[in-house]
């Protein structure tokens, strides 16, 4: 599923090319690109759920963000994300690329990938996908792209 998400992000979402494409046409394109239909449907569902997160009033982690809160990772999350990944999540929050709300959106989408382990590179892409889905997060997206492509730039200033 992650490969389908990456393909969609790189070819449609990131450059706004897929904003008006019909779902059947998109599915056909992905099938022609060699993706499995079940994985395509999982990826499209993943993206739909991501879009729903920003409009959800039923998820308590989307209601408020307080700088006094501290994130404790569950045992399952610690197995899924190694120390390097957990430190990266704290780092991007500390430098203002994400906040508590977007961090929890990232955690939700990571869990939905249904992978037992998520590496740092995949984590970075999921963070970018989440940020890209949030209106007004253009600066955060640019900063995250710099982190993905190892161009620190002005992040630490």
From Swiss-Prot:
Coiled coil: none annotated. InterPro entries: Smg (IPR007456). It holds the Pfam family DUF494. Belongs to the Smg family. This is Protein Smg homolog. It comes from Pseudoalteromonas translucida (strain TAC 125). The gene is smg.
């Amino acid at each position: 599923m992650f490969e389908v998400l990456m393909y969609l992000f790189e070819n449609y979402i990131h450059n706004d090319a897929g904003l008006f494409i019909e779902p059947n046409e998109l599915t056909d394109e992905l099938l022609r690109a060699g993706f499995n239909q079940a994985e395509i449907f999982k990826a499209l569902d993943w993206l739909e759920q991501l879009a729903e997160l920003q409009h959800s009033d039923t998820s308590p982690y989307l209601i408020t963000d307080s700088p006094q809160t501290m994130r404790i990772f569950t045992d399952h999350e610690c197995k899924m994300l190694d120390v390097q990944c957990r430190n990266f999540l704290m780092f991007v929050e500390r430098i203002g690329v994400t906040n508590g709300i977007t961090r929890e959106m990232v955690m939700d989408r990571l869990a939905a990938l249904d992978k037992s382990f998520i590496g740092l590179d995949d984590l970075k892409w999921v963070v970018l996908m989440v940020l890209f889905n949030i209106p007004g997060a253009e600066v955060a997206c640019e900063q995250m792209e710099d982190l993905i492509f190892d161009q620190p730039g002005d992040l630490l200033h």
